[in-house]
A protein has these predicted regions:
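N-terminal small/glycine-rich loop or linker at the start of catalytic domains
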Residues: 8-26, 81-99, 128
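Alpha-helix N-cap and loop-to-helix initiation/capping positions
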Residues: 29-33, 59, 63, 96-107, ...
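Short, well-ordered coil/turn segments that N-cap beta-strands
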Residues: 11-16, 45-47, 74-78, 121-125, ...
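Acidic (Asp/Glu)-rich catalytic clusters
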Residues: 7-10, 67-75, 116-120, 149, ...
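Beta/alpha (TIM)-barrel catalytic core signal, keyed to glycine-rich beta->alpha loops juxtaposed to Asp/Glu
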Residues: 3, 132-297
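Short, acidic/polar
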Residues: 28-41, 103-119, 167-168
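N-terminal binding-site loop/beta-alpha segment at the start of enzyme catalytic domains
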Residues: 1-78, 122
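Active-site groove signature of glycoside hydrolases
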Residues: 116-133
Length: 297
């Protein structure tokens, strides 16, 4: 996979990104599974990996860091995302009673240092805020992010699940560019195409980063009316391209410039997503799928 710029401010990333947002460390042999998945991604040309402090019950970063320290691959050959902001109750977080958001300076600085330690690295390529915390001072948050970038601990700044206005609001306080906004976007959730999020991302010369590109498996196995309707259309169009429905679903995202954020541990699904980059849906096929999603068939 040829690397591309995430925004006009950089950095270069693989066109597909692997994220650990669906991982659970309760599964057996988590480290062996992660090593297998990471090696598969690298083999397929995916060198960009998305983390958060909370993923895998606050343990995924550390497991990935073990892979870095074991020299399974070179740190300079991969691009690392991580994020903070969402806080969840867990035995390792005794002060957290309820799910809440925290983008205070104190929490951001502590989270970055913890992530660097767990990931066994001295810099994060892209650090993201997970949602906007209405109780934190935006000026303080922006100054903290700029300080982290100036220190070299963080190379770029991004956000996750920000509305258009939230994106604009934080950007107005920042003196460094926001290079990405992770948004949920797939054939079963096209809201970002209709509410201005995708348009604003493009206006800022960024690429939409689509999390849950297969809708958490619903595209292939969902039993609700929308999933069945979209899957029927995917099967029809897949025959034309001699491809599977998952590849077509991701090709639909790629067509308007979105980068799929993969979360599955199913190796064949990862390969299907990568295969989507060999397809080029024609305009009318794209709109047929869009209409099927909205129930306008």
């Amino acid at each position: 996979m040829e690397k591309i710029y995430l925004s006009d401010s950089g950095p270069k990333v693989s066109p597909a990104i692997y994220g650990f947002y669906r991982w659970t460390t309760e599964a057996p042999n988590t480290q062996a599974t992660m090593e297998k998945i990471v090696n598969l991604c690298l083999e397929l040309g995916i060198n960009t990996f998305d983390h958060a402090d909370i993923y895998g019950s606050y343990q995924c970063e550390e497991i990935f860091g073990n892979l870095i320290s074991s020299k399974s691959f070179k740190r300079e050959d991969i691009v690392l995302f991580t994020k903070c902001g969402l806080r969840l109750p867990h035995s390792t977080q005794p002060g957290v009673r309820v799910k809440h958001y925290d983008t205070s300076s104190e929490h951001i600085l502590k989270s970055v240092d913890n992530s660097l330690l767990k990931l066994r690295t001295d810099y994060i390529d892209i650090f993201l805020l997970d949602h906007l915390d209405p109780l934190s001072s935006l000026e303080e948050t922006a100054l903290t992010l700029a300080k982290l970038k100036d220190s070299g601990k963080v190379k770029n700044i991004g956000v996750t699940n920000f509305s258009v206005f939230q994106h604009q609001l934080l950007a107005s306080y920042l003196r460094v560019p926001i290079v990405t906004n992770h948004i949920e976007l797939n054939l079963l959730n096209t809201a970002a195409l209709d509410n201005g999020q995708v348009d604003y991302i493009k206006q800022r010369y960024m690429r939409p980063l689509a999390s849950a590109p297969l809708a958490g498996g619903r595209i292939a196995t969902g039993t609700d009316e929308q999933a069945i309707r979209v899957r029927r259309k995917l099967v029809e169009i897949a025959k034309k391209y001699n491809a599977d429905i998952e590849s077509i679903a991701v090709a639909w995202l790629i067509k308007f410039g979105a980068l799929p954020l993969i979360g599955t541990t199913n190796e064949q699904r990862i390969r299907n997503i990568v295969n989507a980059f060999t397809l080029d849906l024609d305009r009318q096929d794209w709109y047929e799928l869009y209409d099927a999603s909205k129930g306008e068939v």
